[in-house]
UniProtKB/Swiss-Prot annotation:
Tissues in which the protein is found: Expressed by the venom gland.
Segments of this protein annotated with the region Factor B binding site: 743-754
Location of the Anaphylatoxin-like domain: 684-719
Principal location class: secreted
Annotated region described as C3d-like domain, given as residue ranges: 992-1269
Organism: Austrelaps superbus (Lowland copperhead snake)
Keywords: Cleavage on pair of basic residues, Complement system impairing toxin, Disulfide bond, Glycoprotein, Inflammatory response, Magnesium, Metal-binding, Secreted, Signal, Toxin
Propeptide segments, given as residue ranges: 657-739, 992-1269
UniProt region (Factor H binding site), positions on chain: 1197-1259
GO biological process, one term: complement activation
Name assigned to this protein: A.superbus venom factor 2
């Protein structure tokens, strides 16, 4: 009777019908609720006027075990029976580790009917932004950043933020918590060994890391330019049908505002997909005059490159422009890309078009017309077809069309086209869509249309909002008011009502636009008809992006707004909201020339914030519920009107001078060609008279003609004719040198203070506006500072965050800094040690008079230059008014590191002067190479005794450049052991498990079990959204029904059988206990006495003294027992019942005193049997029972019973799944997460979704095991590694501790050594150690292995006239000769020529080689990027295998680079890339280079006069003693010249030290050979002869310590006199000299130098 009574009660509860009331109760919430955020919701009682006090409560989902928030409100007629309580869901109460969506239940009680809505939850509670001080950095520099944080009300928020820095490869190298209230500014140090590319700074809230904000910045080597270049195409597109040439205007301005004089090189091309196809014939040199120039792409040049222009439609044109200053000192490369090649010049888009229309009511459509590059197209007429409407686009490219829709139609096709009068109809742009009719509720025909017709809306406006209704008269008469909600940033901002008078079909209200509604809002309105129908509409409204508050940066006075001097004092004034915190930074505008993509702006702020809108359309909806859903709202009513359950917070995304000889030559060519009247022969003659770059004879050239014998004859005749004329012509060149000398009229350089502080950014400050506000409510603050030394324009950017008005980015304030006379010292980012380079000091004179300037390069021993110690190098130059002059200085860096280059200049007769000191980075010679070694640290597998110790052997670096550093970087990254498997079983496929229980005591449990386990799994994995969150209520009802029905089969002693009159079953009773215990975790109404009664019966009636459980009455339906039936039955049954007891422990431990004892007895029994078990199934089941009882922590027996360590197999598939599931549970209980991974994968691969009869145990266990895996894996912290790196140079090892929380943050360290070291790891988990070794390898030109090709490359000077030189500073002729080494000719061969820096190829030569009758090449392409070395790619149809074939063309130098690095030339087969050969070429190194003396890779400057002291007259003994005893003289020797050697362009004099007269640094040199190194040019001046003796001494600075001895340099400071031999000393001519030498030797040897 008791069981039947419970069943009836449960049935009544489950089947209680919904009550019918005369009112409509409504609950509306945001479609997504945010944690820790105040949210407004709406509760309304329509048709009920009785005061009420509803209780709004928030519960966890799915189990509803916690009340997260609760509030009671007053609902009364005075408030319109409408309340808008504010709720707040605390994040601390939720599962932070869950990887699934989380939901809450919003419940309203205290009304005649309860309202309940399951709402998606978001843990993101605000916005966080990062600002870096600039958008581009160099290796080793400092990235400054600041963090701004605010909530969804735009209030400043001080929640902890995690900031991560990620490399371009996505590796997190830094992760730090920041509290924005205490630390607004932080920095991150980039190492020298840093990845180039785009980095990320990612900010996210500590408790909601799934939402983040990312700031980007680039890392690369760069030097700031001194000017910027802007390109402006004549059109934003190339119209394919047009005939106009394409023009690009070039504007170049110095960053301090003055115009640039110079030259531009322009190359056009077409980008097809991702490949750039250059147009070589378009390469032109364009003068930049007064800052402007224009490039033109002619249509015929485009057609010559691409015959079928229609094939280019859909691709883009680009223009690559390189602008160089007149002095050649600076260069900026820019590109105008994205110029679309089109058939129609416009594109049409629909801007958030409403998907649905209301028949018979206006339909508003906003169209957006763009140019092909995506920019807005203004003043373009547009027209809609079918339903006619027309308009013209505004400046922002938009036009609003209003379509009057017809009645009684369910579909509305819409086509809009441009209506430009200059375009034919087929070239007009069109766009089509189809809108669907709004479906009224129950076909009532009631409509609401909300109209907002204003175009540009801004804060402060009064916006008219119209409510337009249509429907039957009876329905309209019931409308007393409209309820409206205003949503912004995903929150309900305001709720109100607009009254409606009787008979009004159109009602209008004014809405005040406040700053809170920026950047956009949604206006949702609805009315009720009766107590059942809701009619709704909504509209999305864009508001002009401005600050909610205000922030202005300006000069504090008119003086501060003028052009400033470097280093001057000035003031700026900040004006903004009271209490605002302002972050400042001043950035050199040159930074934005390199990269302006990442600068923070107000628009970027609002773009991010606007993404918080949970609405997904521009307004409207498919029906009344669709209106709420699409606006981002959740609704439920007392009449079961429910919006669909939302499962994602985001919206789906919808699917850029001429010589006379030249004239004569032209006349000769014309007259000769005129002799051939036929057009084809005329061209053959002309081509024969073209100069041949390769220098081939006329006869050899004729072999390449392919146009027949007549053409070849004409070609040969004309070629020989013109050769005779050319042989008579001569070329000449001029060189002009000027000098002026007025030394006394210049300002002394020692009194000039050099400018040296040139930061990219500075003024990185944070200021609080705490001053009392003025009458307009504005606070202000004045800041004083000194400007830096740069001549530029500084852009001061200010970003504020106010207490209640969010973030405001002020308009940048510019500070221009310059002088009438100054130096711009242009130095590269880095130079290579011992390689010559030219730097330029550009003198700018912005005065109205010409000036004369003296320039001095200051001496630095780290460089070899014309400036030497004690010897100034000065140059005097004239500089015209309003112009510049470049003074070149050639230097050779001799030492690695950062070294000062300093130049000073003064103006003759004036006080005007300037000085600049900059750091020049000198890097080692050779090619930078990387060696990467990866070590896996896994001490549990690879260790001994829990510790893995490994020796890392140093790399063999045989090709390292001597005396250069090795840099080794270690990076250790943890590896979370567990394999996270998202949605391991798709919850949407479990629908079949929620069924209605029925049948006998066994059948009922069989049919109840699926609902229990499905609910258990979906609760644990958070996948109800896949099945439908409403299905959980249904599942709980089915569980309760099965629970109630099972009571029928419960006996008085709490045991169970299939039928009441049948003997009680141990297994069935245990199973009921287990299932009910699981259900009790999900359903509150299961009585613990029911569970514990079964437990007590099992212990008292079925457990034996040895702990084993017996079965006296097996179940009828044996299939429901799964694998427990079969061999080893006693162990299986005992283990199964033990599992049930353990499941019930949390419920029954307080009620059954003997429970623990029973569990211990059973575990003791199982432990005795465990290692002897034969069945994999029984082993797995027993292992789980023992592990759950905390009596087993060793998985060896369990894993030994497995197959492949991932499954426990028997004869039946379901038994395999069941047994493997037990094994997985056992591994999880034992915390063997690494071993659990493969098991989980095997179970998932089975794609088993369960069933009922015959599958009960497999179903229960697989979902219980996978649910447990989902629960434990995110929360387990089984990663605790201690890593120690023992480096030879460190006394203390590097130690790192890695755990689950910091696993993905790389730990890095660097060392300069390349030696063996050891790394040891202990603890749990895995980690990866990456060792990056970077060194400089020697460049070996002769090491290039050539395969199948012979290649020779050479250069020679080309003497040209000014026209041929095309304005170039110099011209070389490049000769490339190759032969294929195979048995037949090589077809389709490519020659890749890298240009020398500063050089461009002669396109006329290349064109002649490819287009003449005598074609030598198939085609060529130019990649002209002069930031790096440009490239010419030459295509050959074949390369001969029998003879050498040569190509010859000119290359022009357009700017100086001093030391020119070799350029590679590579020839390779198109079809076989392994067949290739590379050679290098460079100009004559013996010309114009500074002299230096080198041993190995160590060089000394030798740019001084040769030693001429031995030629001095009137030298006596006192003078010799005085000079030899000078403080800086290191040694005095008598030495014999043994031999003279030549090495690296220097002379090496090998001398035998006969006598040490004055000892120095070199220890024991007597009777030993020593090397004296001298420049080759000093050989004649020294005139040293073999076997002669010499008196020689030198300075300590001229000693060169080598590995085992010392070498000596012969410089201008070296004293050398020939010491006559003994026979000569007897001659009267030499007697006095010999006596002086002997006395000098005795004096210095015996007495030393006088003090």
């Amino acid at each position: 009777m008791e069981g039947m009574a419970l069943y009836l009660v449960a049935a009544l509860l489950i089947g209680f019908p919904g009550s019918s009331h005369g009112a409509l109760y409504t609950l509306i919430t945001p479609g997504v609720l945010r944690t820790d955020t105040e949210e407004q919701i709406l509760v309304e009682a329509h048709g009920d006027s009785a005061p009420k006090q509803p209780v709004i409560s928030i519960h966890d989902f799915p189990r509803r075990q916690k009340i997260l928030f609760q509030i009671r409100v007053d609902m009364n007629p005075a408030g319109g029976m409408l309340v808008t309580p504010t709720i707040k869901i605390p994040a601390k109460e939720l599962n932070k580790e869950s990887r699934q969506n989380q939901y809450v239940v919003v419940k309203v009680s205290g009304l005649p009917l309860e309202l309940e809505k399951v709402v998606l939850l978001s843990s993101q509670s605000g916005f966080v932004f990062i600002q870096t001080d600039k958008g581009i950095y160099t290796p080793g520099s400092l990235v400054r950043y600041r963090v701004f944080s605010m909530d969804y009300n735009m209030h400043r928020m001080d929640k902890t933020v995690i900031v991560e820095f990620q490399t371009p490869e996505g590796v997190v190298v830094s992760s730090n918590p920041i509290n924005p209230s205490s630390v607004l500014i932080r920095h991150y140090n980039l190492s020298e060994l840093v990845s180039f590319g785009t980095w990320k700074a990612v900010a996210k809230y500590e408790h909601s890391p799934e939402e983040s904000y990312t700031a980007y910045f680039d890392v690369r080597e760069y030097v700031l330019p001194s000017f910027e270049v802007r390109l402006q195409p004549s059109d934003k597109f190339l119209y394919i049908d047009g005939n106009k040439n394409f023009h690009v205007s070039i504007t170049a301005r110095y960053l301090y505002g003055k115009k640039v004089e110079g030259v531009a090189f322009v190359l056009f091309g077409v980008k097809i997909d991702d490949a750039k196809k250059s147009i070589p014939d378009s390469l032109t040199r364009i003068p930049i005059i007064d800052g402007d120039g224009e490039a033109i792409l002619k249509r015929d040049i485009l057609r010559s490159r691409f015959q079928n222009l229609n094939e280019l439609v859909g691709h883009t044109l680009y223009a690559s422009v390189t602008v160089m200053t007149e002095s050649g000192s600076d260069m900026v490369v820019t590109e105008q890309s994205g110029i679309h090649i089109v058939t129609s010049p416009y594109q049409i888009y629909f801007t958030k078009p409403p998907k649905y229309f209301k028949p018979g009511m206006p339909y508003e459509l906003t169209v957006y017309v763009t140019n092909p590059d995506g920019s807005p197209a203004a003043n373009v007429p547009v027209v809609s077809e079918a339903i006619h409407s027309e308009g013209t686009t505004l400046s922002d490219g938009t036009a609003k069309l209003i379509l009057n829709t017809p009645l009684n139609t369910q579909s509305l096709p819409i086509t809009v086209r441009t209506n430009h009068r200059d375009l034919p109809r087929e070239r007009q742009a069109t766009k089509s869509m189809t809108a669907t009719a709004y479906q009224t509720q129950g076909g009532s025909g009631n409509y609401l249309h909300v109209a907002i017709t204003s175009t540009e809306i801004k804060a402060g406006d009064n916006l008219p909002v119209s409510f337009n209704v249509r429907g039957n008269a009876n329905s309209l008469n019931q409308i007393k008011y409209f309820t409206y909600l205003i949503l912004t940033k995903g929150k309900i901002f305001k709720v109100g009502r607009q009254p409606r008078g009787e008979g009004q079909n159109l009602v209008t209200m004014n809405l005040r636009i406040t700053p809170d509604l920026i950047p956009a809002f949604r206006f949702v309105a609805y009315y009720q008809v009766g107590n059942n129908e809701i009619v709704a509409d909504s509209v999305w409204v864009d508001v002009k992006d401005t600050c909610m508050g205000m922030l202005v940066v300006k000069g504090a006075s008119s003086r501060d707004n003028r052009i400033q001097k470097p280093g001057a004092a000035m003031k700026i004034k900040l004006e903004g909201d009271p209490g605002a915190r302002v972050g400042l930074v001043a950035v050199d505008k040159a930074v934005y020339v390199l990269n302006d993509k990442y600068k923070i702006s107000q628009a970027k702020i609002w773009d991010t914030i606007e993404k918080s809108d949970f609405g997904c359309t521009a307004g409207g909806g498919q029906d009344n519920l669709g209106v709420f859903e699409d606006a981002g709202l959740a609704l439920t009513t007392s009449t079961n009107l429910n919006t669909k359950q939302r499962s994602v917070a985001t919206c789906p995304q919808p699917t850029n001078r001429r010589r006379r000889s030249s004239v004569l030559l032209l006349d000769s060519k014309a007259s000769k060609a005129a002799q051939f009247q036929e057009q084809n022969l005329h061209k053959c003659c002309e081509d024969g008279m073209h100069e041949n770059p390769m220098g081939y004879t006329c006869e050899k050239r004729a072999k390449y003609t392919q146009e027949g014998d007549a053409c070849k004859a004409a070609f040969l005749e004309c070629c020989r004719y013109i050769k005779g004329i050319r042989d008579e012509n001569q070329r000449e060149s001029e060189l002009f040198l000027a000098r002026s000398d007025f030394e006394d009229e210049f300002f002394e350089e020692d009194n000039i203070i050099s400018r040296s502080d040139f930061p990219d950014s500075w003024l990185w400050l944070t200021e609080d506006l705490n001053e009392p506000p003025n009458s307009q409510g504005i606070s202000s603050k004045t800041l004083s500072f000194y400007l830096k030394d740069s001549i530029t324009t500084w852009e001061v950017l200010a970003v504020s965050i106010a207490p209640t008005k969010g973030i405001c980015v002020a308009e940048p304030y510019e500070i221009t800094v310059m002088k009438d006379f100054f130096i711009d010292l242009r130095v590269p980012y880095s130079v290579v040690k011992n390689e010559q380079v030219e730097i330029r000091a550009v003198l700018y004179n912005y005065a109205d008079e010409d000036i004369y300037v003296r320039v001095e390069l200051l001496y630095n021993p780290a460089f070899c230059s014309a400036s030497a110690e004690g010897q100034r190098y000065r140059v005097q130059v004239p500089v015209r008014a309003l112009s510049s002059w470049a003074v070149p200085f050639v230097i050779v860096p001799l030492e690695q590191g950062l070294h000062d280059v300093e130049v000073k200049a003064s103006v003759r007769g004036e006080l005007a002067s300037d000085g600049v000191r900059k750091k020049l980075k000198v890097v080692p010679e050779g090619e930078r190479k990387n060696i990467v070694t990866v070590i896996e640290l896994d001490p549990s597998v690879k260790g001994v005794g829990g510790t893995q110790e490994q020796t890392v052997v140093a790399n063999k670096l045989d090709d390292k450049v001597p005396e250069t550093e090795i840099e080794t970087k270690f990076s250790v990254l943890g590896d979370p052991v567990a394999q996270i498997i998202e949605n391991s079983i798709d919850g949407s496929k479990l629908s079949h498990l929620i069924i209605t229980p029925s049948g006998s005591g066994e059948q009922n449990m069989i049919t109840m079990t699926p609902s229990v386990i499905a609910t258990y799994y979906l609760d644990a994995t958070g996948q109800w959204e896949n099945l439908g969150v409403d299905r959980r209520t249904e599942a709980v009802k089915q569980i309760m029904k099965g629970y109630a029905q099972q009571m029928v089969y419960k006996k008085a002693d709490h045991s169970y059988a299939s039928f009441v009159n049948r003997a009680s079953s141990s297994w069935l009773t245990a199973y009921v206990v287990k299932v009910f215990a699981m259900a009790a975790k999900m359903v509150k109404d299961i009585n613990h006495e029911i569970i514990c009664g079964g437990v007590k019966w099992l212990i008292l009636n079925r457990q034996q003294s040895d702990g084993v459980f017996k079965e006296n009455a097996p179940v009828i339906l044996g299939g429901m027992m799964g694998g427990t039936q079969g061999a080893e039955p006693e162990v299986s049954l005992t283990a199964f019942i033990l599992v049930a007891l353990l499941e019930s422990r949390s419920v029954c431990n307080e009620h059954i005193n003997i429970l623990d004892n029973s569990i211990n007895k059973a575990t003791d029994y199982l432990l005795k049997k465990y290692e002897k078990l034969q069945r994999p199934y029984t082993t797995a089941l027993t292992a789980y029972a023992l592990a759950a009882a905390e009596r087993l922590n060793d998985d060896r027996v369990l894993m030994a019973a497995s197959t492949g360590r991932d499954r426990w197999e028997e004869h039946a598939r379901t038994h395999n799944i069941e047994g493997t599931s037990y094994a997985l549970l056992a591994l999880l209980k034992m915390k063997k997460f690494a071993e659990a991974g493969p098991v989980v994968k095997w179970l998932i691969d089975q794609k088993y979704y369960g069933g009922t009869y015959g599958q009960t145990q497999a179903t229960v266990m697989v979902f219980q095991a996978l649910a447990e895996y989902e629960i434990q894996i995110p929360t387990h912290k089984d990663l605790n590694l201690n890593i120690s790196i023992n480096l030879p140079e460190r006394e203390v090892p590097l130690r790192y501790s890695i755990n689950y929380g910091n696993a993905l943050v790389a730990r890095t360290a660097e060392t300069k050594l390349n030696e063996d070291f050891t790394v040891s790891a202990s603890g749990d988990g895995k980690a990866t150690m990456t060792i990056l070794t970077v060194y400089n390898a020697q460049l070996r030109e002769d090491a290039n292995v050539c395969n199948k090709f012979h290649l020779n490359v050479s250069v020679e000077n080309a003497q040209l006239n000014s026209k041929q030189a095309k304005g170039a500073k110099d011209t070389l002729r490049l000769k490339i000769c190759t032969r294929y080494l195979g048995e037949v000719d090589s077809t389709m061969t490519i020659i890749d020529v890298s240009m020398l820096t500063g050089f461009l190829p002669d396109t006329e030569d290349l064109t002649r080689l490819s287009k003449g009758v005598d074609r030598y090449i198939s085609k060529f392409e130019i990649d002209n990027n002069m930031v790096q070395k440009g490239t010419v790619v030459i295509y050959l149809d074949k390369v001969s295998h029998s003879e050498v074939e040569c190509l010859n063309f000119k290359i022009h130098k357009h700017f100086e680079v001093g030391f020119i690095q070799p350029g590679p030339v590579k020839v390779y087969s198109y079809y076989n890339l392994d067949e290739q050969c590379t050679k290098f070429y460079h100009p004559d190194k013996g010309t114009g280079l500074l002299n230096k003396i080198c041993h190995g890779n160590i060089c000394r400057c030798a740019e001084q006069s040769c030693s001429l002291l031995n030629q001095q007259k009137k030298i006596d003994l006192p003078l010799r003693i005085q000079k030899a005893c000078a403080p800086n003289v290191d040694y005095v020797y008598k030495a014999k010249l043994l031999r003279i050697e030549e090495k690296d362009g220097n002379d090496i004099y090998v001398m035998d030290v006969l006598e040490v007269i004055k000892g120095g640094t070199d220890r024991n040199p007597q009777a030993k050979a020593r090397q004296y190194v001298s420049q080759r040019k000093c050989q004649e001046a020294l005139n040293l002869n073999l076997n002669n003796d010499y008196l020689i001494w030198g300075l300590s600075s001229d000693l060169w310590p080598m590995k085992n001895d010392i070498s000596y340099l012969i410089t201008k400071n070296t004293w050398i006199e020939r010491w006559p031999n003994e026979d000569e000393c007897q001659d009267e001519e030499f007697q006095n000299l010999c006596d002086d030498f002997a006395q000098l030797s005795n004096t210095l040897t015996i007495f030393g130098c006088p003090t």
